[in-house]
């Protein structure tokens, strides 16, 4: 039986921790067990207590103070230290066999685009710890109001999908913030990104010498055809339930569960 883990990724401020809290609330409300694993050494206080917290091993504030590093350099140091101490992570996660583990990851995409830190951790979780993983890459819905910014996020999501080499879904969070600003028909063109949206606006705002570059980027997005988004309103239980349904399918959660013995009371009632 493999264990199930959800990697929550995305830029800072898009609602990763809010999604983690909403997801664990829903999972627990339907009688399943779940825990949040914090992999952000600079994490702020959370609604739910972290079951496993990288700050128990190393924290960004301590590293910045002792090593005289900046935030990004300190973060890299923290993860290099974690990679040298993966036995600590194995020990912390060792007792959780049939629970849903939600990994709340830092917002710095450099951890998988510039250096293979997160990909290395993912491979270790899969190969040495028996995890069935799914990555959730989150962008916030207001990005659609700035098309170049949205398509920059699409490229980041595609980069994560390619470099992490793990099952993957993409989420457009904070949908309630754009309900009155974006018609449903146009929104569908963002949930299933239409490259023409970017070309039209980018070409109208940039020097003609960049038009070929804009076209090349949109063609690449279209050729890969990998990125689609699921809408999310974190305060809407039905919206969270829909996301969980996708996660269960991707991780084959039901197939990974061992049959449970009926309770004594249930057996007596049948008799």
Swiss-Prot record:
User: Binding positions for GTP?
Assistant: 13-18, 173-176
Q: What is this protein called?
A: GPN-loop GTPase 3
Q: Which domain of life is it from?
A: Eukaryota
Species this protein is from = Yarrowia lipolytica (strain CLIB 122 / E 150)
Which keywords does UniProt give here?
Answer: GTP-binding, Hydrolase, Nucleotide-binding
Positions bearing the site annotation: Stabilizes the phosphate intermediate = 72
Motif range for Gly-Pro-Asn (GPN)-loop? 70-72
Q: Does the keyword 4Fe-4S apply?
A: no
Q: Where are the transmembrane segments?
A: none
Sequence similarity: Belongs to the GPN-loop GTPase family.
Q: Does the keyword Transmembrane apply?
A: no
What is its biological role? Small GTPase required for proper nuclear import of RNA polymerase II and III (RNAPII and RNAPIII). May act at an RNAP assembly step prior to nuclear import.
Give a GO molecular function annotation for the protein: GTPase activity
What is said about its interaction partners and assembly? Heterodimers with GPN1 or GPN2. Binds to RNA polymerase II (RNAPII).
Against SUPFAM superfamilies, the record matches this protein to: P-loop containing nucleoside triphosphate hydrolases
